[in-house]
C-alpha cells in the first residue's frame, strides 16, 4: 500500500534550533504559520472514515465457512489486485455493510518473517492518530494472514514520478512539515519507524476532505524505543543488522548502531533532498554484492557535506540535516523548531503554505488521474516509467563527419553490423523456439502422465483465462505454489528414505564410498556420546525415573 505529504521551507539565516529545550511531550504547534488566521487545509489531518462495523477490533480466529470465497472478515468483499510486494499481495475491497472502500493485505502464513500481525498491533496502538489509516480486521483466511485497513491514494513516490521526478521547493516544504508531524506523533506513542521512504507516505483518496493530506502506512519495521509506562529509553548498542532502505537510512544505521528517534529524522532529511534534487549522490553506486553496496552508500553519505548537498537550494534544508545528524542517541528532536525552520523558506520566497501542491497541476489542473497515470505498483496506484535517461544523451559522435565519403563508409559499417546482429538474433530465436517446443511437449506429457482424465486439463485451461488481477486468480496461484511445495517435500522425503540404511541412519555416501574416520575423529565422537549420555541421565533423574 502506498501514499503522500506536504513540504516546508526555512530562511537563509541558518536559524539555530535548541534541541535541549524539548521534553518528551508533544510540542506546542501554535507557532506554525497560519493563512488568514487558520491552518491551511492541507496541513490538517482529517479523521478516518467510520466504517460502522460495530467493532473495529481484529479477529484472530480462523475464518468461518462461507458460500462466497471472495468475502473475508464476514463482510469485506475482495476486489481487484492493486499491488504486490515482499509482504504479499494487496487487494482493493469493499465493506459490504456501508459500501466504503478498504484495502486488504494478504500475507502467506508460512512466510519466513511474518509482519502483518505486528503491523496490526501497531495500528491498534496508533488508533485515532491523525494521518494513520484505521484498521478494521486481522485474521486468518486459508493459507494467509489478512489485514483490512483504510484505502488511501497514491504515494509520494508515485506523485514524484508523475511530476517529472522533481518537486518544487514549496511542495517539498509543505510535505516535509506534514511528514515531521506524522513522525512526531509516532514517537509520542513510544515507537520509531525505521523505514522512512517516499513509498510509505500516501495522500488520501480523491473527493475526500483529506485528499491532499499525507498519511503514514506500513509499520512492519516499527519498534518501541522506550518503555510505554516508565519511558525508559532502550540502551545504545552496536553491531546491529541494517533495517530500512539504504538510499534513505541514517549514517548511524549504516555503521550498525541501534536506531532511535534521530535516525527517523535524518532519513526524512534525505527524502527532502531526494524530492528537491531528483536523485541523491549515493544512488547508482555499483558493487559486487549488497553488503559492499550498502557500505559504499554509507561511505558516500559520510563524505558528502550537507551544504554541498544543498547547493543551489534553500540553505535551511542543509541546516536541518546538520542539526538532526548531531542529535545524541536518546535526545528528543525539536519537531516544532524543524517545522519553523523549513517554513521560513516560504517566507524567503514570498510564498505561503496554502495547500497547493505540484500534483494538483497535472492533467490541465485536474490533478492526478489513474486513467492517465496508470501503471500498478506496490501500493495499487501506479506511476509511469521513469524518464528514459538514454533519450537525453547526445547523438553518436559520428555525426561530426561532414564529407560524403565518411558518411558512405559509416553507413556500410552500420549495415554490416545490423546484418550480423540480425543473423545472430535469428539464430538465437530459432534455438529458443526449439527449447520452447521441447518444454511444451514435456509439459504436455507430464500433464497427461499425472492427470490422464481430460476433464482436469479442461479445468486447468479454463482457469488460465481468469483475470490476473482477480482474487480467484490469486487463489489459484497460491494453491499451485502450495502443491509444488508439497510435491517438493515429498520428493525430498522419498530421496531421504531411499538413502536410509537398516539402522535408520542416512547413508550420505554410496556404500562403497563411505569415508573412514581417523583416530582423532573417533575419539571426538566417543566424547560426544559420553556427554550425551550424561545429559540424558541428568534429565531423567530429575523426573525420578533414573
UniProtKB/Swiss-Prot annotation:
Which Pfam families does this one have?
Pkinase
N-acetylserine modification sites? Answer: 2
Q: What name appears for this protein in its UniProt entry?
A: Casein kinase I homolog 2
Q: Which UniProt keywords apply?
A: Acetylation, ATP-binding, Cell membrane, Isopeptide bond, Kinase, Lipoprotein, Membrane, Nucleotide-binding, Palmitate, Phosphoprotein, Serine/threonine-protein kinase, Transferase, Ubl conjugation
Additional notes on this entry: Present with 6160 molecules/cell in log phase SD medium.
Q: Does the keyword Zinc-finger apply?
A: no
Residue stretches of biased makeup (Basic and acidic residues): 453-465
Q: What organism does the UniProt record list as the source?
A: Saccharomyces cerevisiae (strain ATCC 204508 / S288c) (Baker's yeast)
Q: Which residues carry this modification: Phosphoserine?
A: 455
Indicate which residues the UniProt annotation says bind ATP: 82-90, 105
Sequence ranges of Low complexity compositional bias: 412-425, 475-496, 533-546
Q: What does UniProt say on post-translational modification here?
A: Palmitoylated by AKR1, which is required for proper plasma membrane localization of YCK2.
**Domain Protein kinase, chain residue ranges per copy:** 76-360
Q: Where are stretches of biased composition, namely Polar residues? A: 1-33, 44-55, 497-530
> Where are the active-site residues found?
195
Gene3D superfamilies the record matches: Phosphorylase Kinase, domain 1, Transferase(Phosphotransferase) domain 1
Amino acid at each position: 500500500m502506498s501514499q503522500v505529504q506536504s513540504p516546508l521551507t526555512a530562511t537563509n539565516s541558518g536559524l539555530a534550533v535548541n534541541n535541549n529545550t524539548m521534553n518528551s511531550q508533544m510540542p506546542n504547534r501554535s507557532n506554525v504559520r497560519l493563512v488568514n488566521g487558520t491552518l491551511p487545509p492541507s496541513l490538517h489531518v482529517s479523521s478516518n472514515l467510520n466504517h460502522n462495523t460495530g467493532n473495529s477490533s481484529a479477529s484472530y480466529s480462523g475464518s468461518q465457512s462461507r458460500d462466497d470465497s471472495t468475502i473475508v472478515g464476514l463482510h469485506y468483499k475482495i476486489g481487484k489486485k492493486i499491488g504486490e510486494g515482499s509482504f504479499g499481495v494487496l487487494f482493493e475491497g469493499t465493506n459490504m455493510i456501508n459500501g466504503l472502500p478498504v484495502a486488504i493485505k494478504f500475507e502467506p502464513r508460512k512466510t519466513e518473517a511474518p509482519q502483518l500481525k505486528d503491523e496490526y498491533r501497531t495500528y491498534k496502538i496508533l488508533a485515532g492518530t491523525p494521518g494513520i489509516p484505521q484498521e478494521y480486521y486481522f485474521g486468518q483466511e486459508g493459507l494467509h494472514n489478512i489485514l483490512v485497513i483504510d484505502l488511501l491514494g497514491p504515494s509520494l513516490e508515485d506523485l514524484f514520478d508523475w511530476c517529472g521526478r522533481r518537486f518544487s521547493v514549496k511542495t517539498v516544504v509543505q510535505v516535509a512539515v506534514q511528514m515531521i508531524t506524522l513522525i512526531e506523533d509516532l514517537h509520542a506513542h513510544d515507537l520509531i519507524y525505521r523505514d522512512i521512504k517516499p513509498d510509505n507516505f500516501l495522500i488520501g483518496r480523491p473527493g475526500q476532505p483529506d485528499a491532499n493530506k499525507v498519511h503514514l502506512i506500513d509499520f512492519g519495521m516499527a519498534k518501541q524505543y522506550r518503555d510505554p509506562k516508565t519511558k525508559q529509553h532502550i540502551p545504545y548498542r552496536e553491531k546491529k543488522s541494517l533495517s530500512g532502505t539504504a538510499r534513505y537510512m541514517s549514517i548511524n544505521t549504516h555503521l550498525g548502531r541501534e536506531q532511535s528517534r534521530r535516525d527517523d529524522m535524518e532519513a526524512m532529511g534525505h527524502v527532502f533532498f531526494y524530492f528537491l534534487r531528483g536523485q541523491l549522490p549515493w544512488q547508482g553506486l555499483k558493487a559486487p554484492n549488497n553488503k559492499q553496496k550498502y557500505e559504499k552508500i554509507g561511505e558516500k553519505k559520510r563524505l558528502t557535506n550537507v551544504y554541498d548537498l544543498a547547493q543551489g537550494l534553500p540553505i535551511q534544508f542543509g541546516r536541518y540535516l546538520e542539526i538532526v545528524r548531531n542529535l545524541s542517541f536518546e535526545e528528543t528532536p525539536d519537531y516544532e523548531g524543524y517545522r519553523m525552520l523549513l517554513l521560513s523558506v516560504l517566507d524567503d520566497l514570498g510564498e505561503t503554505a496554502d495547500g497547493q501542491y505540484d500534483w494538483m497541476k497535472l492533467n490541465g489542473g485536474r490533478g492526478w488521474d489513474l486513467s492517465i497515470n496508470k501503471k500498478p505498483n506496490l501500493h495499487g496506484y501506479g506511476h509511469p516509467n521513469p524518464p528514459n535517461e538514454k533519450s537525453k544523451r547526445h547523438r553518436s559522435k559520428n555525426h561530426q563527419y561532414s564529407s560524403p565519403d565518411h558518411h558512405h563508409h559509416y553507413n556500410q559499417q552500420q549495415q554490416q553490423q545490423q546484418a550480423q546482429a540480425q543473423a545472430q538474433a535469428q539464430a538465437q530465436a530459432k534455438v529458443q523456439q526449439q527449447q520452447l517446443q521441447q518444454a511444451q511437449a514435456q509439459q504436455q506429457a507430464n500433464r497427461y502422465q499425472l492427470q490422464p482424465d481430460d476433464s482436469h486439463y479442461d479445468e486447468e485451461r479454463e482457469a488460465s483465462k481468469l483475470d490476473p488481477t482477480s482474487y480467484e486468480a490469486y487463489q489459484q496461484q497460491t494453491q499451485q505454489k502450495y502443491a509444488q511445495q508439497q510435491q517438493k517435500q515429498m520428493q525430498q522425503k522419498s530421496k531421504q528414505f531411499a538413502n536410509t540404511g537398516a539402522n535408520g541412519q542416512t547413508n550420505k555416501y554410496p556404500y562403497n564410498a563411505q569415508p573412514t574416520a581417523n583416530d582423532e575423529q573417533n575419539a571426538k565422537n566417543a566424547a560426544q556420546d559420553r556427554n550425551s549420555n550424561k545429559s540424558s541421565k541428568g534429565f531423567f533423574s530429575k523426573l525420578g525415573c533414573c
